Every structure is written in C-alpha cells, then in structure tokens.
C-alpha cells in the first residue's frame, strides 16, 4: 500500500527531526516513540512469521528502552528540577540513560535484539534499522556525553567492537553479518564520543554511506546468504566485483574510505594518551576483518561445485540505479578527500 508506506516514511522523518532538534526530554522521547511506531509496519510488511516475530521483538525492546529513558529524565527532574537534555547531572539518571540509549542503539550488552530483528526484516528495512534509526539515539548520546560515565562507555565500546567481530565469524546470513558489523562500528563511535563529537559524526556518516552501498548492492543481486553470493556474479559481474572493494572498505582497509574514521579515531585516542585503548580496539577490528574477507571471497573468488546451476542465472541488461553506483564510488574512493576533512577539526 503506497499511502501507508508514505505515512511511515514521513513519520520516520518527523520523529527523527523532533528528537535531534529538541532541548526538552519529553519532546526527545516523543520523537523516539514516533520513530518506533513508524518502522513497525515496514518490518512486518512481508507477512511472514519471521517478520512478525522481528516486529514484536523490536517493539518490546524499544518500548522498554523508551520507558527507561523516560524514567531516567523524570528521576533527574525530580532531584534537580531540570528537563533540559544537556542538564542531566544526577548519577542514577546518567546510569539509566546510558542503559536506555545503549539498548536503542544495540551496544553490548544490550545488543541481543539487533541481529534477530535485522534477520527478520527485508534488506530495505534492514538498511533503515542499521542507519537512520541509529541517528536519534546517537544525537542524544552526543548531547549528554559530558555527563555520562566514561569508563562505562569505554568498556561497552571495546566489548561491542570485540563481540561484533567475534559473533560474526560463524554467521552465514548476510543480514546477520551486517548486524554484527553495525555493533562493531558503534563501538568505534562510542569510544571517541567524549573527546571529539565531530569525529563521532564523521564516523557515523561514513558508516551509513558504506552500509547503504552494501545493502543496496545485495538488494540488486538478491543475495541473502553466503551460498547465494557465490552465484551472484552471474547477474551483474561488474557490481559484484566492486562489492568486494566496498566490503573491504567497511572493514577499514587502506586505501579505501572505511580506513579514514578508524585512522582519525586512533589518532585522537593517541593524542588523549589512551594508547592502550587504541591498540586494543585496533586489534579487535581484525576479528571483523576476517568475516569481511570471507564475504569478499565468496562474492568474487569462489565458484559453486555444480556448474549447471549458476549458468541459469545469467541476466542480461539488468540496470543498477544511480544511487547505488554513487554510494559505491564514495565508499571506495573518498580517502583522497581526507585533508579537507582534517581542516574541519
């Protein structure tokens, strides 16, 4: 139903705008609730038991996180009389807010829902969940980061980077792999959030761009699991070859775009004399590199054992839309612009 889809998309835009532009906790909470209610029809749209299950899980987790957030800000208002987002000073409220926003984002140890929900959604809805739905909670985290416990945030960030890489190792479904990739990238964004807000936003924008390029490519080739990646090259060979580079960019390999945020974050952590933290999180990113390499290997180098099956999949003149090609180009070739990005700091 196009009307219902339009209402959902407009509600998503409205909810996100309300949250990121509000100073009052009640308005921020309202925006988050509008977002949650708007995405539910999109998750359950396929009318499949797995989609219904994903929508139910998403609703229960997000409702619990929103309740915790509301409890946090009312507790702060009770003790300090302040409803302003930047005036969150009570320690219990700060702890509750950290838990609430971490649940909204899918940071460890509140990550359990995210891979399951992404697996039950379509690729387009999965893209929204992995990118647009993270923007309002990231904004709230930026606005309140000066009040939050940095030791707790650092531990959560490092465990997110570790678990995001480790849990993705034995996955065969592309959506689950991208979900664990998202958890790992959130760890990188969270670890730098107190020291440099701009850097967190740059990392988030680049992550969204790279993830969008990969989701749209997988949607074009209709690839949902590793075994179908082996035959995807017959549909659009050139796109599949470029997908390998996009995956390696998401892994953070130079000279691709994904190397830029990791380079800047490690540089900033070193400036702040957190060399041990920088070393640990850099080593943990090697776990993620393994499954990105496995995806790239399946996409371009591996052939299925039965040659008769994949020859049937030849598709001639299948067009790739302009958005996908633009995003993939940026995902691969943005690193030369890094001096211009440095000048913004």
Regions found by a protein language model. Give the residues of each.
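Core, highly hydrophobic multi-pass alpha-helical transmembrane subunits of bioenergetic inner membranes
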Residues: 1-345
